[in-house]
Amino acid sequence: PENIVVGINQKDTRFKDSSILDNINHTPITSTASFYDFIADDIISYFSKNYKISNFKVIVGQERTANFVNFFLLKENPIFSGVISISPKISENMNSYLSDNLSKINSKIVYTLSTSNKDFESISKNVQELKILLDSIDNKNLKFESLIFDKENHYTLPSVAVPNSIRNTYSMYSNIDKVEYDSIISKLDTSPVDYLINKYQLINDFYDVDKTISINDFRFIENYIVENEFFELYDELSKLAKQEYPWFFININR
């Protein structure tokens, strides 16, 4: 989907913006709390008032800011539905904070965490520990993915982590491709039409976008029907197609 990308210049303020935490709960205070409010109140408010945007917003951080962005997930109703945390310098208590909150969160969240085997040792170790915690969460509202790279060091990691994390963040939004068809759809024991409906419902639930079912996706479901000779499903599929494309007609010769 189309996105508006906002960058914040932190050339001389990165530490005080993202790393001033209290000594007891290890949560933002003073300048870091102010920076949190600046994003939550000023930036989000400005773009909400001046642009037509959905409720699905993504925040990206690396190292100190990768830890900082996690604080947005500790609210009951996070303002960000997508978080990309690249090589986070994890603060004390953060692992337990995230594990506890994401286990019971009611909002739809897409969370992508990344590091490298050649990252700083302390960061890589802590990220791997967080990965284990988040992998164990059983919550249908959380879509969590960890990306552990092999060759990139701490400074080159963003060059591969950013595009791969974005791809993961929007993976559910993509049209059906051969990989999805071969690995999932072709092995379905339930109706492929129901799968298609559910796929687009998830897109709406996670991304707050009412996406029209693509003709490409109708074609893949039709292919399943033909391959398996479940021709009785044509009626169900045609009703859905007419609902999505009432003005469209395709003549198929076989």
Language-model segments: residues:
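Non-catalytic cap/lid and distal C-terminal segments of serine-dependent acyl enzymes
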Residues: 1-254
